[in-house]
Every structure is written in C-alpha cells, then in structure tokens.
Amino acid sequence: MSDKKNYYYNRELSWMDFNARVLEEAQKKDNPLMERLRFLAITGSNLDEFFMVRVAGVKSQIASNYTKPDDSGMTPKELLSALDKKTHAFMEKQYSCLYRSILPVLKKQAEIEFRTPEKLTPEQRAFTDEYFHRVLFPVLTPLAVDSSRPFPMLANKSLNLAVRLSSKENKGEKCFAVVQVPSILPRFTELPADGDTRCFILLEDIITDYLEELFELHEIKAVCPFRITRNSDLTIDEEADDFMYEIEKSIKRRKRGRPVRLELLQHTDEDTRKFLIKALNINESGIYEVQGPIDLTFFSKFANIPGCEKLCFAPIRSTTPPGDFFGYTDIFRAIREGDRLVHHPYETFDCVVQFIAQAAEDENVLAIKQTLYRVSGNSPIIASLIKAAENGKQVTVLVELKARFDEENNINWAKKLEKAGCHVIYGLTGLKTHCKIALVVRREEDGIRRYLHLGTGNYNDSTAKIYTDLGLFTCNEQFGADASSLFNVITGYSRPPEYKHFIVAPHGMRSFFEYMIRQETENAKKGLPSGITVKVNSLVDPKIIELLYEASKAGVRVQLIVRGICCLIPGIEGVSENITVMSIVGQLLEHSRIFRFENAGNPRIYMGSADWMPRNLDRRVELVFPIEDETQKARAFGILDTMLSDTTNARFMQSDTSYEHVDLRGKKKINSQLTFYHEAQARLKELQSIEKDSVLIPIHSAEE
C-alpha cells in the first residue's frame, strides 16, 4: 500500500487504548463497586506486563541504535516518546478514578474506608502496634546503603521504602536505607471498626509509622515508597542441549533484568529521588510519579473481602448438564452421537476435565495426546494425565515451556508428568506451540476410534471461569486423521502433511486466510454474496490488514470483533468504509477466535487458537478448524450474531482510532455475555425436562 503508515495504527498505542477501555469499566458508575476496583487492578497488572515486555523492547531497540520505522511509520524514539506521554496521562486517570469516583462511594454507600496512621482511633492504634511487633517486625530487614553495602537487588514489582537518614551520633552525616514491604504478607489489613465503618490500612503505612524502631541510632528525614518494573523478556538459546535447564537459567536472569520503570509518590523528597535514580541507573523517561498508593493491583484481592458480595457482579455460573455430559454419563457415547460445541464459561469447563478423566480410567482407551500452554496451579487435567500413565496408557503431552510468565509452572508440571511415565515434549525449536488439542485413541467393537477436543482457549480450569472460549468435541474420522498427523509433526520429525480439514500454522494458515479474504474480494466484484466476520483478540498483521482494505474497496462488508490491539483503521474514505471494528470489554474476558466467510452464499465458519498477528501466523504452532456439523454451525453463526448485537459492552473504533460506545437512543440494551448465560440456562432446563420425561415411574399397590 503506497501510504501504509496512514492506514496502520501503532500496536503499542492500540494496546494503551485497550487498557483505557478496561479503565472505563472501573469508571462506569453502573458497575458494582467492588468490580470497579477489580477493573482498576486489572489496568495496573496489564500495565506492569506491558512495561516488562513491550516498553522494555522499545528501550532495547533504542539502546542498540535501531532506527528503522515500524509499520505505522514510527521510529523507536518517537514511539517511546508517545508512550511516555500516553502512559503519564493514563496513570493520572487511574488515580483520578480511584479518588474521585470509587473511594468516596465506597465510604458513603458501603461504609468502607482506608485509613492512614494519623487518622486511627485509639483502638485501631493499639491494633497496629500489636500487629507491627508481633507480625511485621520479625520479617522486616532494613538494608543500609553505603560504600561497603551496595544498593540491594530488589525483586521485580516489589514495593519498597527508601529512607533518608541522619546519624544522631555523627551530626549531619546523611545516609540511605531500603526496607522492602514483605510481599508474603497481605497488602492491606482490616482494623477494628469505627462505629459502623469498616476500616483498612495499607502495610506500608504501618511500617512507615514504626520505622524509628528499625533505625534507633538515626533520625528519619524522609520516607519514600517506590517500586521498580524490570525488563522481563526472556532470551533463550533454543539449541541448548538441556532446554529445560536453559529456560530455568533464563528465568533467573529475568529476575535481574534492567529497570524500565520507577514508580514514586508525587512530591518525593528530592535527595531521595536523586539517590534512587542513580542507584537504579534509570533516566527521567522511566520515572512515573503517582498520587498513591503505588501498585493498584492489590485491589483485585481487596474486591474479594467477605461481606461485600452485593457489591460484586452476580456470578455467571457454568451450567452443568444432567449426568456428566449433555445428559449422558458416557462422554464417548455422547460424542459418537454427534459433534458437541461448548461455550465457556456459560457451559461448564468440567466437561473438558471429565473428558480426560474418563479417558484416564477407561480400560478401552489406548492413548491420550494433548498440548498444554497455560494450566492452573492445581490442574485436574494434569492429574488425570498422570493417572492415565499410571494405568498403563500411552500418554504424550506437549508442555510449552516458553509460555511467557508461566515458564516455572510449566517446568514443574513437565517434571511431574515425566516422573509419572508420560512422554513429554517441551515444544519445537524456534516456535511456540499454542494450539489447543486433546486426542483420545479408544478401542471399540468396530475398531479404533479417535475422539477429539479442539479449543480456542487454554486447558486451564481456573481461567475458564472468567474467559469466554469455545470447544468442539468430535470423533469425525478425518478430523482424527488430521489430529494424528499434527501430533506426529509435533513429537517427531514428520513433514507437515496436507491436512484434510485442519488449518495449521506456521505451514498453511497464513496462505489459507489470505486466500479466503481474496476469495471474498473476488466474489464481491462478481456480484456474488460476500462478507467477512471475524472475532480475535488482536489484529496486527500488515498483510492481512492490507487484504481487508482491498476487500472493503471491492464492497465486501467486513465486521471485526477485536478485544485488544487493532492496527487496522476502519472508516477511512476510499479504503475502509465497509469495515467496522468492535471491542467487547465486560464482566468476562473475551478470548475465543471465530472466522466466518460468506463464500458466495455457502457460509463457512472456523474456530481456533490463532489471532491475526505475525507471531501466530508465522512463529507459532496454531490450529484453526472448521465447524461442519450443521446444528453446531448454526449455533456458531448465532454466537457471532449475538456479539455483533451487543450495545452494553461494545465500543466501536472510529477513523481517528478513538473508541465510542453504542448510541442507545432507539435501541434495545443488549449485553451479549448475559444473553449467552440466559441461553445456556434455558438449554439446561430443556435437557432436564427431557431427562425427567424419559424416566419411567412404576405404579405400586396401595399396600406398598
């Protein structure tokens, strides 16, 4: 495209816009109060990871004198300057939301407030005194910083207190010390109530109030809370002889990554500020001064305090089908009778857990093969895989050790699986394995049958409660053959085959999507039915974006549901008038990936693990699969249509890259997530009714 930079929005700036949409949920007054705090905490944890990876990457480019503009036309220095400006403004909005919009309402409506030491009642003062001496004092370690004691290596994202001191013995002698706020203790503590008001105090405030007891020979001149964020992107030698050991070494190096952000309170003592800048070797562009408290992520736990259930969203509980699986106690029988599409969390993820659990115990199951990218800390799926191996089944598991920030967890699981006798693959050289697939090979009367679960999300029973994802259960023979071929590629040296139905990256997925978009463009030019509807988490790939622009120019209606980063710009005259971009941010995190192409009046729909990003299409093993069963296909179409009708959680991207809520005038208020929940409840009642009607009740004599 001749002037591509005008039509390609920078991915980092787009990510900042996404985090701003999450912040809007914290600002939204009709959201429950504790949920607003939870959204605020999410914006903080999102920003942490953004600095650890993306901002760190930009700074590394600048340090290595890399000056080439990106696809949006920005050089690394220009981008860092734009991010710096946008981040400062964003963090101001975070604290404005907290102090102007949330905490006053928390005090007025819920009678809950945070207190500082000077506002404590005598009873509360006695409580903090006892808490400090009994709990805190034994844990705290004051670390002096001088010529013989260097500045300590502080943990990434840890909260610390910088203390400027003056010696009582040597008048005028200045020195500094650091006290780390113990991360092992809760960030907040509930105080004795003040009348009807529930009161809380932050851990750092208690420590600050009693610092003199740690520095009896010194006079405290200033106390400054601070927090550092380190470069946490891993550099891994994938050719290493012991790949697991190489990952473990990289994790240790990450803990010593260079600081990329220093958070301070506004009006921090100037001498202490200079001391920290020098000690951490950080420049002004990495310093962020906030109103406080530093690090808002603790509000995610605070939102769960007992007694505040009415201040939270009504839970969207998964429906549990009668029996174990849609009215069947035998999962394999249910799948034999037809493909099953499951929409989480509206329909329980337990069916996926049960699929592996039943396979582990079934004497007719010969083998289980599965990919794992992110799993929970106490995964029932891994427990079942271990059980299956102990029961003598052939169990092969690909555990992706390079899943960012889950490396340690995955290493631990890989070791346990190996110890149990599973064949464990750590991933593929140069690629991350991100596809979601489980294959069960079972011996039956008519021969060997392969049962599959294919998904859009991780095999993680914890996140499955709050992420929306889709999964397909099938025993389609051709799907099974494709699955076996895929596992042969992953576990051995097989050449990528010609799959009958699967679309697999990095060999074939890019060309498939490019072909499908071009096909819709040609259909539009011929006057045939055309259209593209896609739901992904991120849209970044320049080539895909360029093809979507060409489709729009040809008259193809393109409807995009992109939760996070979107580098495509809709509504540009002569380029993208026929493209709409919607982002849904609400109670649940939208995570499913769905692709619909009108195909000249014979629509085709696909689901899978891949977003439209270069890393997914070119540098990962990803899987996208078609929905072919007519009943499930109709349901998949309906899922997309419901999302497109959302008027509550949806925002639409404008041609200036801003996002606007739906104008509700004359429109019905529709929350797609609640719609799916109510539909799932209705299906459950229907199944229960069918089950009840099928029960035969014997008539007994009156004497009985």
What are these regions (language model features)?
Residues 1-532, 550-554, 566-704:
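N-terminal localization/anchoring segments of enzymes in phospholipid and broader phosphate metabolism
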Residues 542-545, 549:
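Glycine/threonine-rich ATP-lid/beta-loop region of ATP-binding domains
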Residues 557-561:
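Hydrophobic alpha/beta core scaffold segments
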